[in-house]
Amino acid sequence: PEGTWKIYTMHLSRNFGYHRSYINMMNAKSCKILLDAVYEPHYAHYKEMFGSTIAGFFSDEPETGNGHIYEIEDKFGTMVDFPWSSDLFGVLSEEIGEENFWKLPLLWENGADVDLTANLRYTYMDAVTRLIQKNFSEQVGSWCREHGVEYIGHLIEDDDHHSRLGSSLGHYFRGLRGQDMAGIDDIGGQVLPGQENVCYNNGTFQHRNGMFYHYVLGKLASSAAAIEPHKHGDSMCEIFGNYGWEEGVQLEKYLADHFMVRGVNHYVPHAFTAKEFPDPDCPPHFYAHGNNPQYRHFGELMKYMNRICELITDGAHEVHTAILYDGEADWTGDVERSGKAAQILYDRQADYDIIPQDVFAEREFYHTQIADGQLVVNTQHYNTLIVTEYHYITEAFAKAVKEMTAAGVKVYFIGAKPEGICDVTADVADMGADAWKEAARQANMQMAAELEQAEVISYEKLADLAAEKLADTVTLAPSNDRIRVTHYEYGDGSGMVYLVNEGDQTYEGTVTLAETVRKPAGKERTLTGYDAWLNQLYSVYTEEGSNAVKVSLEPRKSIIWILDADSQAENDTPEIESTQKAVGEDRLTETVQQRIHKYRGTPETLADGWMRSTCRSIDYPNFGAGKEVSLPDHLEEEEPLFSGFVRYEKKVRIENPANAILKITDAAEGVELFLNGKSLGIQIVPSYVYDLSDAAVQGENELVIEVATTLEREMSTIPNRYGMPKDDPK
């Protein structure tokens, strides 16, 4: 015909692209090769250890393998190769008919009919991700469980890539369906203090979406763990790796609290290395053959994490707001990713889960119910659903919106409602373009009717809703956008509230528990504080006649409150020490911070007369010659390349040992305090506050403070493995 035409040619290849030796994630026989070559030989050799010494197998960043590694600009409509398999051929032949494979160029073409393009891309991705789910994830997971072990791991989530092919698996929830935990990883500066809104793209390995890492990444894991019945609430994060030698226990504690308060309850610390020190691959290394000064301090952090993870396991996190997973929408057109909506909620202490549209299509699997003002998905009960701006949604979700709004569940679309249905089905013999377009028009009209009762709101309105209605665990006065909170409930009627300060300033104010948290079903619960670092309970004082608690929460520190319906009853909380010093009639002690707050005298400042000595970690505890110094000490100016232990010694007079407290306002980084030869423990986040009463004597006392640095300064002269320049040591 006359006019300008575009001619497409498509080619199938067995050996095209960058990853020609990869298994085909969509092909059952190809994935079976992995089991035959790796898993079966391990079982043959170690089967008596399976289920005991060997807990399971870990898939680290499995990928479809098309395109270049970690390419983030690989949406449909770009010139990349797309994966194919005989299984996929069969599925698409059933879905659209082999005679309609003429539509496949729409994977690349952006100038065609938008509805037809969205439908083809959704159909392709739905088939690809379902095959990956079945032939890779579920096949490997089933093998593991049949052999008495678990299957865990994570896919590439970086910068919202969890919904793409290439270096990921196309759909976060489907890609991990066969695993026993919902996994993620955080490496290389993805989550960093104060960088919630820092975003850039400078090429491979140099891109960052701070909003995704801080507000979506952790919640993907805890959400999948909660809504998928076979995961039993278990999530996992590979953590700490590749942050560089400058990462120490202070940053590691921030990262641990960051993910635990978001509900992640299992961790795989990355990375130990058997190579000779210094190994340039993905530092820091926690032991480093004895060269890392913070190894013992890291051990104390592991104890802290274990205690909190015990508290966020075998129950359910109480969340009443859900955000719709944006993965399917990313396949079909432009989409407002979830990060901004998530940030608006989380910065106002309104917690949320992220749920896929699959919960409406696979109701039996997810135990989905809609009734009495609630959307129930497995253990979770939501009264509000947030949908960012999508062009297309599935037919199952559109029907569910009508059902939810009729049942009293609030459904909010940000900015605009969707324009169409992405999985249109039509009873036309040849699925020709004209017939299909008419079917799409009818489906879109039906969708508009189903969404009629849902409300369109702005981000500004969402912020108001978050502050006024959706933040239903605690209220802060004054408000603060860096206090994070999670609410967890156990089967015995007890609960837990966990707060973390991710900001850089101490929060001074009042935290008021919601009435539904303190008194579920009208029955008041006892409120007890738990110091997870010291593993001690303490008294919590509420303002008379209210659920308000005055708090002072320093940066990178946490508060945990245990809510117990029967304070004498046994519960599933970890074994906790109660200190022996009761205050008045209380069965528990006050914290050292509470005692400082009550102190009305003038504290003594210990600035002068300190003897300082140093040693490398490998030489500890053989310190060198001492030098008299005053505090604050600026060792970094004298020895700019030193890393190791710094020891400060001083004799101090204590007249009232029973009330003696030492507060160290800052140190870099880990601190261990000795009084008269007795260690009073390791602390890793300032201010470092120690109760001296157990070791102090009236009169003269010998005080020793040992500070463990990072390895950053010692390693600053060694080039990194990428040949990139290093920043000046902090």
Language-model features, listed with the residues they occupy:
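Mature N-terminal, pre-catalytic/accessory segment of carbohydrate-active enzymes
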Residues: 1-60
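Short acidic/polar inter-strand loop motif in beta-rich domains
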Residues: 15-16, 567-570, 708-716
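Carbohydrate-binding surfaces of carbohydrate-active enzymes
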Residues: 46-56, 61-642, 653-657
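Short beta-strand segments within Ig-like beta-sandwich modules, predominantly Fibronectin type-III
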Residues: 541-542, 680-684
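Exposed aromatic-hydrophobic patches
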Residues: 548-551, 689-695
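Short, well-structured beta-strand segments enriched in hydrophobic/aromatic residues
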Residues: 558-559, 698-715
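Short beta-strands within extracellular/lumenal beta-sheet-rich domains
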Residues: 642-653, 688-689
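Aromatic-lined ligand-binding clefts that engage carbohydrates, nucleic acids, or primary amines
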Residues: 652-654, 658-676, 683, 703-707
